[in-house]
């Protein structure tokens, strides 16, 4: 009887492993769910706002089609405190895995599935969370979410193949929605602390990273004490990971959570009339005589001359990307001089 039980148990394990292998193979081959092609993984759509920068390097403002106003920031312009806080809190073995952390996953399965511990922590890596942000719409029910999980695993493994760890961290922080129209870490740092990401203090970085668990629940503007508690949890995780000493952690946890909240709007900034004029010039199309009334012929000749002689006039229509499509003024980086 005991042998039969052992055989049955191992048979069940084998069937489960085979089923998982079949599911993952079907997902990887595109038979189940949507797995983006290589081209899409290599060029994810982050919808960054265009930055208008003066000749002396000052930011005049941005152009954006939405209220998100997401502005790109490179890895070199991120505070190391942000990176340390994110890795320590969300994925402590980030540097060691290839998209899936088997140890974290099994821990989550055992604690949540067997011991029913609601606060046992998740098993998703930073790369899996990035895959979810890019390609998983909000699930309507538990079964739909369960199907999304293995698809995210496959996408996460592919992302790890095409991007470095630094690039994955950068995309994650540029993609995340920190609420209050603060999408992306650069806008979030400006909105909550009135500074660039590279200048964030340890406790400020911990506050923003604390929002990654649940931005609505840990919104520092609405729930200061709750957000402070979450910040302190992040600081403690940084201590456990070796990024902070016990003394540093204790002193930072004692600090109040102080914001310099100032919503960022793409319509704000310097030289607003000039920026609007420049936008009109760069998005102009090649003049067509049929679009001009009889009394507008002088305007037609002026626009035609500008099209032929001014490289900025109609810049978006004149220039194309590597894929053959025209540039979009709302998704490119522009340097100009007022």
Please place each PLM-identified region on the residue numbering:
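N-terminal type II signal-anchor transmembrane helix
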Residues: 1-53, 113
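Peptidoglycan glycan-strand catalytic modules in the bacterial/periplasmic cell-wall system
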Residues: 46-49, 53-245, 251, 267, ...
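Flexible loop and strand-edge segments within Gram-negative outer membrane beta-barrel domains
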Residues: 263-264
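Terminal amphipathic helices with adjacent charged low-complexity linkers/tails
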Residues: 249-260
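SIR2/sirtuin-family catalytic core signature
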Residues: 303-312, 320
């Amino acid at each position: 009887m005991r042998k039969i039980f052992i055989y049955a148990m191992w048979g069940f394990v084998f069937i489960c492993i085979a089923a998982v292998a079949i599911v993952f193979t079907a997902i990887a081959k595109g038979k189940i769910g949507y797995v983006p092609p290589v081209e899409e993984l290599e060029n994810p759509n982050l919808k960054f706002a265009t930055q208008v920068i003066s000749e002396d390097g000052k930011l005049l403002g941005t152009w954006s089609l939405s209220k998100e106003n997401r502005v790109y920031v490179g890895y070199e312009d991120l505070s190391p405190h942000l990176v340390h806080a994110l890795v320590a809190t969300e994925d402590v073995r980030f540097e060691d895995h290839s998209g899936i952390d088997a140890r974290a996953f099994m821990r989550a399965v055992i604690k949540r599935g067997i011991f029913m511990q609601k606060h046992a922590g998740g098993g998703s890596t930073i790369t899996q969370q990035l895959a979810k942000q890019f390609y998983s719409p909000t699930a309507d029910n538990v079964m739909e979410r369960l199907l999304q999980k293995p698809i995210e695993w496959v996408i996460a493994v592919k992302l790890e193949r095409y991007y470095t760890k630094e690039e994955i961290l950068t995309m994650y922080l540029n993609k995340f929605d920190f609420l209050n129209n603060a999408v992306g870490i650069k806008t979030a740092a400006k909105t909550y602390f009135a500074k660039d990401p590279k200048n964030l203090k340890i406790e400020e970085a911990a506050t923003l990273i604390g929002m990654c668990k649940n931005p609505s629940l840990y919104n520092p503007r609405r729930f200061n004490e709750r957000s402070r508690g979450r910040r302190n949890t992040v600081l403690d995780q940084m201590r456990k990971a070796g990024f902070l000493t016990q003394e540093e952690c204790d002193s930072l946890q004692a600090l109040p959570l102080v914001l310099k909240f100032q919503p960022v709007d793409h319509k704000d900034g310097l030289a607003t009339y000039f920026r609007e004029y420049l936008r009109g010039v760069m998005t102009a199309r090649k003049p067509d005589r049929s679009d001009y009334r009889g009394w507008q012929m002088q305007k037609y000749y002026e626009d035609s001359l500008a099209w032929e002689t001014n490289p900025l006039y109609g810049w978006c229509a004149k220039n194309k990307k590597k894929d053959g499509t025209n540039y979009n003024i709302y998704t490119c980086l522009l340097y100009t001089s007022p």
